[in-house]
Curated annotation (Swiss-Prot):
Region (NLS binding site (major)): 149-241
Name under which the protein is recorded: Importin subunit alpha-5
Post-translational modification: Polyubiquitinated in the presence of RAG1 (in vitro).
Organism: Mus musculus (Mouse)
Residue positions, PTM Phosphoserine: 63
Domain notes per entry: Consists of an N-terminal hydrophilic region, a hydrophobic central region composed of 10 repeats, and a short hydrophilic C-terminus. The N-terminal hydrophilic region contains the importin beta binding domain (IBB domain), which is sufficient for binding importin beta and essential for nuclear protein import.
Length: 538
């Protein structure tokens, strides 16, 4: 394990101390956070319950109130599916049959329309409160179910629409309905609460503060139908989700035990949402990471990296990646689960986002101790990383650059030489021309670490010649470093100046020679001329 003393010694050997261990591994506020912020098509935070034609037909046949159903269906509807006065009259009538029939009509409007008239429903005075009142009708489970369905679909709308459901007092009643003896009612209550929690961090915290977790977790202890389990784990993931601020960990950590066995359910939807929940819970300081590790989920998460559905692989990879942002011991737990072979496989994924997050995960492993860097070498991962550094999309190249530079920062002389022999210098030099200042710094730091090793070798063998200077010149790196002396970022131009002065000597600069800019590639263009044996004379 890396000791604080070793880390401090490593830092003191830098001229530029900006790349500290926190920057090397715990890149949560930058690349790591950016990875989490991206919109995921695989997971919806809100879901509308839409009946299929088959379900509708079955319902018509099984309905006891056939006359009332026909009465509703024959109502004169205004253009655009507006709510009729008959519907509101029936909602507020004292007849349970009329109440049910009208509620079903509202439900159909909110379920079938491509653009459901949610605003029209909530703007009809007293209607939302009436549906909440119907939730309390324990003697009429069908009315409870239909009302819950209506409110679920209202809560599937925008934040203002969701707030109407909350302000009508629905949340505590929905939580009570999680313990209903009728599974249809339970499931619809879960769905509604999932929609409300998925709206915003404020709604999520309100639902948590209403003490949803005990009855929700109790649902998992029963033999449920699959749709119930799917809805419940989805609601659970929404309760764990959110960064600004995250949920109070003490309120969501009790779900870890349930999540640990949900990882062994065969259904991909259940697996995906369980993995997302674990990725949210592991996204934070080391004590949260430790709680996730202590739940015993790491080995199964690593196994799921090889799942055949990206819907499962993406959140499993996110969770594994979050865990290795922890300390060396926490990172080792993942390594002990044989994660590297799975990660190597993901580096060749046709899905760019998977490839990128695999690189990000590996970059946090190479920020560990030398033994951990060696496991990455032994797994033969660096050839793939260097290939990615040369050919992948820029967002993926960035993560590969971090993985390689982190290895040069903490690696031994032999480990750094291995990276040079694999050909890491040329792609690092190529990154010096990109527009992203942070990645230019990462590439400069990697090259500096290599040059420092060369200087030590030159002193040790008495030759006085740094073997890596020539390799950087051959890769047109010297041109690029010299150009960076005029970079607008102070840290970059200072680092470039220091590298030239310390490793390449001072040479006259022709300020009239400036590279062109290729905006499509987000980088500068340098003429690729042959380097003379004595180096460049600019």
């Amino acid at each position: 394990m890396s000791t604080p003393g070793k880390e401090n010694f490593r830092l003191k050997s830098y001229k530029n101390k900006s790349l500290n261990p926190d920057e090397m591994r715990r890149r949560r506020e930058e690349e790591g956070l950016q990875l989490r912020k991206q919109k995921r098509e695989e997971q919806l935070f809100k879901r509308r319950n839409v009946a299929t034609a088959e379900e509708e037909t079955e319902e018509e046949v099984m309905s006891d109130g056939g006359f009332h159903e026909a009465q509703i269906n024959n109502m004169e509807m205004a253009p655009g599916g507006v709510i009729t006065s008959d519907m509101t009259d029936m909602i507020f009538s004292n007849s349970p049959e009329q109440q049910l029939s009208a509620t079903q009509k509202f439900r159909k409007l909110l379920s079938k329309e491509p653009n459901p008239p949610i605003d029209e429903v909530i703007n009809t005075p007293g209607v939302v409160a009436r549906f909440v009142e119907f939730l309390k009708r324990k003697e009429n489970c069908t009315l409870q179910f239909e009302s819950a369905w209506v409110l679920t679909n209202i809560a599937s709308g925008n934040s203002l629409q969701t707030r109407n459901v909350i302000q009508a007092g629905a949340v505590p009643i929905f939580i009570e309905l999680l313990s209903s003896e009728f599974e249809d009612v339970q499931e619809q209550a879960v769905w509604a609460l999932g929609n409300i929690a998925g709206d915003s961090t404020m709604c999520r915290d309100y639902v948590l503060n209403c003490n949803i977790l005990p009855p929700l977790l109790q649902l998992f202890s029963k033999q449920n139908r699959l749709t119930m389990t799917r809805n419940a784990v989805w609601a659970l993931s929404n309760l764990c989700r959110g960064k600004s601020p995250p949920p109070e960990f003490a309120k969501v950590s009790p779900c870890l035990n349930v999540l640990s066995w949900l990882l062994f359910v065969s259904d991909t939807d259940v697996l995906a949402d369980a993995c997302w929940a674990l990725s949210y819970l592991s996204d934070g300081p080391n004590d949260k990471i430790q709680a996730v590790i202590d739940a015993g989920v790491c080995r199964r998460l690593v196994e799921l990296l090889m799942h055949n559905d990206y819907k499962v692989v993406s959140p499993a990879l996110r969770a594994v990646g979050n865990i290795v942002t922890g300390d060396d011991i926490q990172t080792q737990v993942i390594l002990n689960c044989s994660a590297l072979q799975s990660l190597l496989h993901l580096l060749s994924s046709p899905k760019e986002s998977i490839k990128k997050e695999a690189c990000w995960t590996i970059s946090n492993i190479t920020a560990g101790n030398r033994a951990q860097i060696q496991t990455v070498i032994d797994a033969n991962m660096f050839p793939a990383l260097i290939s990615i550094l040369q050919t992948a999309e820029f967002r993926t190249r960035k993560e590969a650059a971090w993985a390689i530079t982190n290895a040069t920062s903490g690696g031994s002389a032999e480990q750094i030489k291995y990276l040079v022999e694999l050909g890491c210098i040329k792609p690092l030099c190529d990154l010096l021309t990109v527009m992203d200042a942070k990645i230019v710094q990462v590439a400069l730091n990697g090259l500096e670490n290599i040059l420092r090793l060369g200087e030590q070798e030159a002193k040790r063998n008495g030759s006085g010649i740094n073997p890596y200077c020539a390799l950087i010149e051959e890769a047109y790196g010297l041109d690029k470093i010299e150009f960076l002396q005029s970079h607008e970022n102070q840290e970059i131009y200072q680092k470039a100046f220091d590298l030239i002065e310390h490793y390449f000597g001072t040479e006259d600069e022709d300020s009239s020679i400036a590279p062109q800019v290729d905006l499509s590639q987000q980088q500068y263009i340098f003429q690729q001329c042959e380097a003379p044996m004595e180096g460049f004379q600019l």
